[in-house]
């Protein structure tokens, strides 16, 4: 299977702080990769370099096997990369359709009718429930997230990055999102999920890549790993969670770490 994106020895520093150090990572087309790590491990910084928010100090980014230079989100879009951030970048007083086409040529008049038609086609293809004419301020958080995803797909994204996408969702909304992401994978898109939730990693992804303190630890097949292994990769030591039964008269379970 062909690689959609590859990172080779990517490093990023902020002053004396090393956010990412010689990180190597690859994601294939038609694959969901979970980027796992504790808070501060460098996950979002790494993805922000792919999406054009930051520029790496050193290293290479390859799209479809060719080295590229990404200095802005506009550059990222030109390479069919879309990132859905935790904090949505939408204009509240605009409709879903207006946000999706914002910045494109001919976004008014006849072209808007064609844009709306395309938005509906994308929604039907991936199972989104979106009203193109609904104002953003009238939407729930999950609906706003849907607009961001459709916006990326509308602009041709084949590589989608989602930063902690379930942090604002209910369990039912999370289940619905995962169904959509699997459809994208089956359609040949590369999907990267930034997360620290182990149970979601194991239920959704095909592979898991782990970062610790800004460094790449390794990548494992989801079907061949478990929470204990992933936790050890995240923190650098074994942590076993065992429930030990206390004396009967206390009737209290103790968590031993």
Range-by-range predicted roles:
Residues 2-257:
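Glycine-rich phosphate-binding loops of nucleotide-dependent enzymes
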């Amino acid at each position: 299977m062909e690689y959609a994106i590859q990172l080779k020895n990517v490093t990023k520093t902020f002053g004396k702080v090393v956010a990412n150090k010689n990180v190597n990572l690859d994601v294939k087309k038609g694959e969901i990769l979970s980027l796992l790590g504790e808070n501060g491990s460098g996950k979002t910084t790494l993805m922000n370099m792919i999406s054009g928010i930051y520029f790496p100090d050193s290293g290479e980014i390859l799209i479809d096997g060719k080295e590229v230079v990404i200095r802005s989100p506009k550059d990222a879009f030109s390479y069919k990369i879309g990132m859905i951030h935790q904090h949505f970048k939408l204009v509240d007083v605009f409709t879903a359709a207006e946000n999706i086409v914002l910045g494109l040529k001919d976004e008014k008049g006849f072209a808007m009718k064609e844009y709306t038609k395309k938005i509906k086609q994308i929604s039907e293809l991936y199972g989104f429930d979106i009203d193109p004419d609904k104002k953003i301020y009238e939407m729930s958080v999950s609906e706003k997230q849907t607009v961001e995803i459709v916006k990326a797909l509308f602009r041709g994204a084949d590589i989608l990055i989602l930063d902690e996408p379930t942090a604002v969702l209910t369990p039912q909304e999370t289940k619905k999102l995962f169904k959509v992401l699997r459809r994208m994978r089956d359609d040949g898109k590369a999907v990267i999920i930034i997360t620290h939730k182990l149970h979601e990693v194991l239920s959704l992804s095909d592979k898991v890549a782990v970062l610790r303190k800004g460094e790449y630890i390794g990548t494992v097949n989801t079907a061949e790993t478990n929470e204990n292994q992933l936790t050890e990769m995240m923190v650098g030591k074994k942590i076993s969670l065992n429930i030990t039964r206390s004396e009967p008269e206390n009737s209290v379970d103790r968590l031993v770490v």
